[in-house]
UniProtKB/Swiss-Prot annotation:
PANTHER family listed in its UniProt record: CORTICOLIBERIN/UROCORTIN, UROCORTIN
Classification of source organism: Eukaryota, Metazoa, Chordata, Craniata, Vertebrata
Signal peptide limits: 1-22
Record-linked InterPro entries: Corticotropin-releasing_fac_CS, CRF, Urocortin_CRF
Name of the protein described by the UniProt record: UI
């Protein structure tokens, strides 16, 4: 390796290992939460589904606001591990994915098409089995005589 790239690599590694993690995080989380609330409220659109999702997200953020204020800024270890989030965050991720799940609307036409196709295939399979069973009975009757 040439000396210039080696020196640049060495300095970048040394600089990144000595940066405290607190400098990479916002100092005031309430500012970030209020901006997120504004984005959610203004960008939700007029659709009923987007309104419901925005409402659920707003409830979720308000519910977790107390935990963020009480906990302050998270202090992570200097070397991050594979598991950075707590089990409580797993539950919150499940709640967020629950918001995006499909509701109980009637199925769309493509779903109906595939449902009908599956039913037709199953009916054809059952018919083939009945025909094969009839042929097997006929052969057994012939051989049994």
């Amino acid at each position: 390796m040439k000396p210039v790239p080696l020196v640049l690599l060495l300095t970048s590694v040394l600089l990144t290992t000595h940066i405290p993690l607190s400098t990479c995080r916002p100092r005031d989380l309430s500012l970030m939460n209020s901006q997120l609330d504004d984005v959610l409220l203004n960008g939700a659109g007029d659709g009923a589904m987007s309104y419901l999702v925005g409402e659920k997200l707003l409830q979720y953020l308000q519910r977790n606001l107390g935990a963020q204020k009480a906990g302050g800024v998270l202090h992570l270890p200097h070397f991050p591990t594979a598991q950075l989030h707590s089990p409580h965050e797993d539950n919150s991720l499940e709640e967020l994915t629950e918001f995006s799940k499909r509701n109980d609307d009637p199925p769309i036409s493509i779903d109906l098409t595939f449902h009908l196709l599956r039913n037709m295939i199953e009916m054809a399979r059952n018919e083939n089995q009945r025909e094969q069973a009839g042929l097997n009975r006929k052969y057994l009757d012939e051989v049994g005589k």
